Amino acid sequence: LGQNVLTAVKPSQLMVKIVHDELTQLMGGETVEIDTKGQPAVILMSGLQGSGKTTFSGKLARMLKTKKNKRPLLVACDVYRPAAIEQLRVLAEQIDVPMYSEIDSKDPVSIAQNAIKEARAKGYDLVIVDTAGRLAVDEQMMNEIAAIKEAIQPNEILFVVDSMTGQDAVNTAKEFNERLDFDGVVLTKLDGDTRGGAVSYTHLRAHE
């Protein structure tokens, strides 16, 4: 390791710090807060099917509610998978956060716009829009999420990727970024894989 071990610090604690510092450097070296300015601030989720967007949407809502005193509204814009709406509803109930959906609508752009109107009317200062999973090669689906972005002008667009995707995540992230110009990457399921192929897009771009 080549590190001087301080006598007042346990070797195990020093190891944790070394790993933390290395991971911080790998992920870009700086901590950047999510932009939650606005009435409401809007965060748009994007990513492949099964990447963990819905679960992360709930976790993000809970974190911003408890640590930033935000009043979030979760929005179900996956009009293709009814189970996704139910999953988001259950998560919303568990964290005591309201959820907006339109069961009979097949227009995610309209749903997202109506949700923002609902947030303004009821005083919610944060809207988290959960969208359907999609492949970058599916032109129709990519046009759809681009239309959602254009309609709601989100503060942040997050690309959610399963860390078990491996190096394929690099190409997928680049393809999504070309269409959406996203602001950040969320790595999910980090406890389930050791390959570490999906890494910070900031790191990837710096080493192209």
Where do the protein language model's features map onto the residues?
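Primarily NTPase-proximal linker/entry elements flanking Walker-type ATP/GTP-binding cores
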Residues: L1-C77, A84-S105, I111-V129
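Short beta-alpha junctions and helix-cap segments that line functional grooves
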Residues: T31, L60, E144, N171-A173, ...
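Short glycine-/polar-rich loops that comprise or flank the Walker A/P-loop
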Residues: N69-K70, I152-E156, L180-D183
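G-domain G4 guanine-recognition motif of GTPases
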Residues: C77, A132, V161-M164, V186-D193
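Conserved ATPase-coupling elements of RecA-like P-loop NTPase cores
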Residues: A84-I85, V137-M142, A169-V170
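Inter-motif core of Ras-like GTPase G domains
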Residues: N143-D162
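Active-site/ligand-binding-proximal alpha/beta "capping" segment
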Residues: K149, A169, A173-D183
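Conserved small/polar residues in nucleotide/adenosyl-binding loops
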Residues: T202-E208
